[in-house]
Amino acid sequence: MPLYEHVFISRQDLSNAQAESLVEHFGSVLADNGGKVVDSEYWGLKTMAYKINKNRKGHYAFLKTDAPAPAVQEMERLMRLHDDVMRVMTIKVDEHPEGPSIQMQKREERDNRRERR
């Protein structure tokens, strides 16, 4: 099955638990359609470069999936219809890199720098 990476931004007024439950919800949509979530990361509440739907911040989430194209299309369709999801981006990749994503690596590096001071 093809490999995909998805990033979506949800509204800023959601709690962290609600934003993380969206990841689980869309993972179950994939599972119902014959796919699976290989890895998921919640990147947290981040400030955006510009407003989207009158929101200056958003909860970012990242999914690595292994799913057939119809399952991904159904998940994207439901994401775009969901009121809490503001933006969705999906890319097809040849392979999933091992370890955490670049965003999570940056956070770990920042924590290491603070410890050295």
From Swiss-Prot:
Task: Return the protein name.
Answer: Small ribosomal subunit protein bS6
Q: Which GO terms describe its biological process?
A: translation
| Record HAMAP family | Ribosomal_bS6
Tell me the SUPFAM superfamilies matching this sequence.
Answer: Ribosomal protein S6
Span list, region Disordered:
92-117
| Task performed by this protein | Binds together with bS18 to 16S ribosomal RNA.
| InterPro entries assigned to the protein according to its UniProt record, in alphabetical order | Ribosomal_bS6 (IPR000529), Ribosomal_bS6_sf (IPR035980), Ribosomal_S6_plastid/chlpt (IPR020814), Transl_elong_EF1B/ribsomal_bS6 (IPR014717)
Where is this chain compositionally biased, Basic and acidic residues type? Answer: 105-117
Q: Does the keyword Ribonucleoprotein apply?
A: yes
Could you name the Gene Ontology cellular component terms for this entry?
cytosolic small ribosomal subunit
Source organism of this protein record:
Dinoroseobacter shibae (strain DSM 16493 / NCIMB 14021 / DFL 12)
Per UniProt, the keywords (alphabetical) are:
Ribonucleoprotein, Ribosomal protein, RNA-binding, rRNA-binding
Give GO MF terms, alphabetically: small ribosomal subunit rRNA binding; structural constituent of ribosome
Return the similarity comment.
Belongs to the bacterial ribosomal protein bS6 family.
